[in-house]
Amino acid sequence: MRLPREIGPIHFVGIGGIGMSGIAEVLCNLGYTVQGSDASEGANVSRLRDKGIAIHVGHQAENVAGADVVVVSTAIKRDNPELLAARAQRIPVVRRAEMLAELMRLKSCVAIAGTHGKTTTTSMVAALLDAGEFDPTVINGGIINAYGTNARLGAGEWMVVEADESDGTFLKLPADVAIVTNVDPEHLDHFKTFDAVQEAFRDFVENVPFYGFAVMCIDHPVVQALVGKIEDRRIITYGENPQADVRLLDLTPNGGSSAFRVAFRDRKAGTAHEIADLVLPMPGRHNALNATAAIAVAHELGLSDDTIRKALAGFGGVRRRFTKTGEWNGVTIIDDYGHHPVEIAAVLKAARESTKGKVIAVVQPHRFTRLQSLFEEFCTCFNDADVVVVAEVYPAGEAPIEGVDRDHFVLGLRAHGHREVIPLQESAALASVVYGAAHSGDYVVCLGAGNITQWAYALPGELKALD
């Protein structure tokens, strides 16, 4: 049985969240009656309202009146008045992943998981399948520049979704094709141990049906170890590793883009194939690896080499993934969502490869618990930055932790050999700090999952005002 067409209204608590908004948009486009609430106004709320979805600002019990089902994310606390009202009225309450799973049952599905790179890889798979005239339905964790949204309803038989592992609910997703980009210690507030994280990813891959396949990056040692543990499922490995089934070769940075080729090896059939002259209009080895995963899926689903080559060259990127927000006197300002040490290191390496000037990193640490649990890693991931500007921790609803703050982070960076680390007293002071540090040819990279994106977009204008 599939989601009945007559069900509704479907009420989303926290509808403006990036994960929730995409599901709500696709359900609305399918013809379901969708409504919701969010704590504040925002771009996603405005976009959904423009589609005719009724959205309340603020959470109140009466908002769920008349709903057939209430959808919540893990960000919604148990004492939320709408959640309490739904349960008091015996309205079914489902998690975000459960509703996503209902949509996935309508199509064949590619699900992209991993600690880092999910959103970009999801966008790349979508772009390639779009170019191959698959007309896929897409639900992503970031705004795809080509669509201007994080979701679209396609008429084709395939769906491409980002699988969020943060609360373990990605195990509910019925994927036919699974991608695993990497597995690092993250979301330990839910999983408790890194062993549990790895076991969840193993289960995610083993949930793929026997007629499907998984695409896994063996450049990552944890993923390589997982490949050896998975039984009775078809695995396609990728990476620069010589043992990979789909191998990234001759990666050459070229300013803001990357050139490379990809070689395919079918061990069972004893055949080999190569796609040469690939160009991705994004810098960084991590993005080339993400593209290799997408190419592996596209090739397996029958796309031609030329289609893959053209689609990749025209890839428009994802908002908040190495996004240029402007320039000032030859200085390039970049906005990036990177908030984990592995992501930060990859983004700064891409910036280093893109310029002969200095790389100035502006970081807004996201969550006290993340900074605490990965403090050593945070203190060693800025090696490609000439200057590190450190803002106050963005709490994301967390209470402060003694000894885990901006100033201790600054001391930690200096203790690990960084010679120029600047504590940012307030966001309004960022322009003057950059004005004094940056020169033509430099890159200023704003990093974090909080409101630092607003600073990144305001910075070019603020710098011009100081001239």
From Swiss-Prot:
InterPro entries: Mur-like_cat_sf (IPR036565), Mur_ligase_C (IPR004101), Mur_ligase_C_dom_sf (IPR036615), Mur_ligase_cen (IPR013221), Mur_ligase_N (IPR000713), MurCDEF_pg_biosynth (IPR050061), UDP-N-AcMur_Ala_ligase_MurC (IPR005758). It is an enzyme of class 6 (ligase). GO terms for molecular function: ATP binding; UDP-N-acetylmuramate-L-alanine ligase activity. Its EC number is 6.3.2.8. It is found in: Cytoplasm. Pathway: Cell wall biogenesis; peptidoglycan biosynthesis. Disulfide bonds: none annotated. GO terms for cellular component: cytoplasm. ATP binds at G114, T115, H116, G117, K118, T119, T120. It catalyses: UDP-N-acetyl-alpha-D-muramate + L-alanine + ATP = UDP-N-acetyl-alpha-D-muramoyl-L-alanine + ADP + phosphate + H(+). GO terms for biological process: cell division; cell wall organization; peptidoglycan biosynthetic process; regulation of cell shape. SUPFAM superfamilies: MurCD N-terminal domain, MurD-like peptide ligases, catalytic domain, MurD-like peptide ligases, peptide-binding domain. Keywords: ATP-binding, Cell cycle, Cell division, Cell shape, Cell wall biogenesis/degradation, Cytoplasm, Ligase, Nucleotide-binding, Peptidoglycan synthesis. Its main location: cytoplasm. Cell wall formation. Belongs to the MurCDEF family. This is UDP-N-acetylmuramate--L-alanine ligase. It comes from Rhodopseudomonas palustris (strain BisB18). The lineage of its organism: Bacteria, Pseudomonadati, Pseudomonadota, Alphaproteobacteria, Hyphomicrobiales.
